[in-house]
Amino acid sequence: MQNRQTIFIWAICLWTVTLPSLSGQTTQVEGSVRDPSGAVIANASVVLNSGSYQAAVNTGADGHFLFLTVPSISGTVDISREGFNPVRQWWNLGSATSVRLEIVLHPGAASEQVTVSAARTEVRLSETPGSTILLSGKDVAATPALRVDDVLRQVPGFSLFRRSDSRTANASNQGVSLRGLGGTAASRALVLEDGLPLIDAFGGWVYWDRVPRASLASVEVFRGGASNLYGSDALGGVVQFITRQPERPAFSLETSYGNERTPDLSFWTGTRIGHWDLSLASEMFRTDGYIIVPTSQRGTVDTPANSKDATVDLTVGHRLGEKGRVFARGSFYTEFRNNGTPVQTNDTRMGEGAVGLDQQFGSADSLTFRAHGLVLGYDQRFSSVAANRNSESLTDIQYVPEQVVGGAAQWTHFLGKHQTLIAGMDLMEVMGASDEQLFLSGTHTRNNAAGGRQRILGWFGEDLIRWNSWTIILAGRFDDWNNFNASSICTPVFGTCTSPSVLYPSRSDLAFSPRLSVLRSLGRNVSVTGSMYRAFRAPTLNELYRSFRLANVLTLNNPFLNAERLTGAEAGVNLSMLQHKLDLRGTFFWSDIVDPVENVTTDPSSSPVLRQKENLGRIRSRGVEFDGVVHVNRDIQISAGYDFTAATVVAYTVPPEAVSLLGNKVAQVPQNVFTWEARYWNPSRILLSVQGRFIGNQFDDDQNLYPLGRFYTMDLQIGRNISRNLEVFAAAENILDERYKVANTPTASGSLFNIGPPVLYRVGLRLNFPSEKY
């Protein structure tokens, strides 16, 4: 008994001695907030409570938060962010000198997710008065497709020139179209990676394979004219890839091997050391490909169209206090392609560097700055193939050097909780040329060098108002584009030049692109939207100064092209029912494009058939979009989308030796597109995803003489986690083995088809540290 009393007395004394020191002790509480993919979540609200003490901060651009002098050793933090389910976490100092917390916020209902592409600032999807599709990291992982452009094909209204894909098609066939605006090599939608342009500034096409899949946190697709914020190229919308930012040591790898001898490796790794963060991403791909000409038309010159590419991306960032970050990024990309015959090949080498700043000033202002530069070399060989396809002769060796510099700055100011003001500017200058060695019957006859420089400077502003059940966005942008130092110089080698050398005069033009968008919520589950806008696209240097040949068709450049001008409107309804388990959206859209740049047939009877890039007159695209998703439970999801587009030529001035195109359907635009997906995603049991895609009839040419028939394909992926960090899977694309037509081009005896791929299957594994939480 006496021993117990002694122990008790000593305990009271010890507590009495230490109490003053504990009461005066302060604790440092810090941490980071990220989503399940590992991407940091900026501007999340963090509220710390400990007894009567309370403090609040927002996470910085790097997802970090910090409380320096907390007068307690335990408490809670409440973390919330629009688009995510809130989290409360307990903390205790214990024996450490500070508290470090790692918080993961899981996305909330689909209507509460956040998009940045629609307004150049974060807006809840339920408050976005526009047609936006969000693909999460889970959506990308669940897609059986191997290449990122094939992932986007599940978005109704998204298409590439000539139904091509990046596995085997020439880079110049990778122009993006949204909402039936028609396709050429140049994109009519802007493609970004973390705010930096992915579109080739010289040609307008996209090198999709520059984006390692393992680095993706999400993908956003905004459909509808967006030149009001993004300028040229955003005629039909914006596609943006959002990559992961490191918060703690992490590593992700996906590797697979498939038929056609197709190995692939994609990985991302990142870490944070003090105020520094570092990430490295890379992807390597190769395929032996397939013969793109049908068996009935093949000759001895037809060989598999194949490709190989590699990309590496290194980013270093440094945190500036609690609310800022600077970074530098460097990337390198290389590819080689065989385009279906021994002579016809192309290869690309590209290096890019970028620096950026994200800085918050107080609670109401932020500044974003980006600058980048790119150097590219593109080689291409063209040939003339004999009618029996048993021989070919070299016709053209092209080399395209390209240099690009650009920058952008954006200021954002929050006027309380209900209004956001945005102002900014961006500048891009590209210098490029097409240096050609031309051949006739195997003889080198002349050299031709054509090219120039293009500079586009834009200023934009936006007022975003959210009041009660209304969201109103009023935005506008002025662009000034200039072409200068342009020329076409011919040097004879054998014989004479068919056209004289020309020094083109400098040209300039202005464009104003306004947009008014309104959303009205009719209760918690229904909203209606409407938008009116204008947009534009300046012709690329490729369209102005570079010619190209495909099979028996020679398409000439046109140095006198005008900018495309679009006027559009849309109206839609959004429904969310069954406690957000069912989300539906329908949108009607209407667009008129004046002076669209199209490949117009000028002499169909010649050999090769002659086409030239022309300002067609006016085309009109109108239609409806439907998107829906059913969340049966946490593991099962069913989604579908449908797009109906009627795109026709409504005004046309017939040039000499050409035929009238008035009333024709716009080339490369299918009238009907339907996609669907059913997914069961439970890593502890099975990962199963089935997708289907129907593409309707379309035409390959402006005269509507060469149709491309409808087709339906299905893809499948099945997998399972065999440990917390390791997943094995098998995937197959085109499991119905539908050999659909990709191209239909005229020949002297009829037409030549190119066909899509056969069944493509692969097996692989995904390795993630820490483990992914879907």
Which positions does each model-derived feature cover?
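Short, acidic, small-residue-rich periplasmic hinge/interaction motif at the N-terminus
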Residues: 34-37, 45, 49, 80-84, ...
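Extracytoplasmic beta-strand/coil segments of soluble accessory domains associated
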Residues: 132, 149-200
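Short acidic/polar hinge/loop motifs at secondary-structure boundaries
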Residues: 196-223
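Periplasmic-side early beta-strands and strand-to-turn transitions of outer-membrane beta-barrels
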Residues: 227-228, 240, 248-256, 268-349
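C-terminal beta-signal and adjacent terminal beta-strands/loops
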Residues: 290, 536, 592-594, 599, ...
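Face-selective signature of the C-terminal outer-membrane beta-barrel domain
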Residues: 319-333, 349-496, 503-504, 519-521, ...
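Outer-membrane beta-barrel signature, preferentially recognizing the C-terminal barrel domain
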Residues: 345-360, 396-405, 448-456, 502-517, ...
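Gram-negative outer-membrane beta-barrel transporters
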Residues: 466-472, 480, 581-585, 589-593, ...
